[in-house]
Structure formats: C-alpha cells, structure tokens
C-alpha cells in the first residue's frame, strides 16, 4: 500500500499533490516519506490533520499553492513514443471480443509502431488463452516470466481453495459469453499482435517500450489502479454491459455495442459497436480515410 501511494504521488499526470495524514496511523506521513524518496517541494505538499486546528482551511491554503504552481505549466506537443496506455475490460459481453477489444488491440499495435507503450493486465481473465501471449514473447526469458505470471495466479487461487474457472460472471453470461475461454480470448484481443516486450510485477514501473503484461487481478478498480501505478497515462476500458467506474488516471470508456452507447451516453466515450455496422477498423482507430488523406 505504501509503495502504491508513493507511485501515485510520483505519477506524471499529477501537476500537484496534497498528501493527507491523520497523524497516528501506521502509514503516517513520516513513514510514507521513506517510500516517496526525493520529490519536488513545489509539486508535493503534506498535511497532518491532527497538527492543525482547521484541516480544511489549511488544506485549501496548500491547494492554492499547488494550483499556482500547476498554473505555470505550458502544454507542449509530445511524440507518441512517450505515451503509456493501459488496457482493461469489464462488464464484457458477446461483442467485446469482436468489436471493442480488437479496436483497442489495433490501437495498441498502431501506438507501438510509433514507439509507444501499452500495458495489458487482469491475469485471471487470460486463463485459457494465455498461450496466445506466450507465443508472442520476444525471448525465452519473457516466455518464462509469462508462464510464471499465469501459474502464480492459478496457484494463489488453489492455495486459498478458490475455483480457478469460476468465470464468466452472471452479467457476462447474460451478455452472451459462455465460457472462461470465450472471455479470455476476448481479453487477449486488447493486446493486438505485437510482441510481448515486458512482464511486470504489481507496482513495477514500465521500463521497456512496446507491449507489457502486468501482474494484477481482474477486479476493475484494482487492475486499473495497478495500470496507473506502473505508469499508464490513460486507461482504455472496454465494456459491453456498462459501468461508471473510473481510476486514478483518465479512463476512456469504450462500448462494444451501439445499444449501450446510446443508452448510457453519460458513461461511454467511444462506441466500438459501429465496427459491425458501417465503420471500418482503420477509421475506428483514427487512421485517415481516403477522403481525409486527399
């Protein structure tokens, strides 16, 4: 937990950070400082609530300082190679593996072709389709790490008397997913066709560009937070059933079907359901059409 908090404090998306502590908890601010290490005192402020008379007023003063500091920033264009994008699905349906997840996979391939980085997680959702990822590992070391990634989660389940293949959920089944393998084949679609260039432990930061696999469970909040901890600037979240969930970084909701996109337009940012209607994949992931190129 302390390592995770420190990772979020250092996350590049945060222009300013106010770290709040009570004062007598186990993970108090002095303890947390050992995990934070070096930091910019203009960007990170600390407030221990028991030390001040009015913590809300004190917090507002510190937030004003942080806002003034962030106000000195200027937007600048960056190369696509600097981007780190997390990929996650939740509330999947029968179209997730046909529309939304392949769309994210095509985007992942496009970003990687420009030198960028993507991260795929939710390891239990890979069970049954893991060999597709193993066969794309760039070398033997990564292959062995991927095998361990899968087996470690399976061993965790069995050691705690949990059923490995309890997926899919009732919502998945109602949406048209019949088996875990069906769901897993959809999950792995988000990885596109690129080689696996990195396998990360939980909270481990990305250090290799390209496609990375991250050790984290299938739970939406935990997995998306894990993506942020590893450095993801944005999470692309596909769904067929719908969810209002968000994470510590901007979370782009991608629907697998047009019905959901129309019914929950306040939840959904992009409708991938058009892929089975009238929109080619090339346009779906942002490539210019013939008319646009002219």
Q: What does each model-found stretch correspond to?
A:
Residues 1-234, 241-293:
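Metallocofactor- and cofactor-centric catalytic cores in central/energy metabolism, strongly enriched
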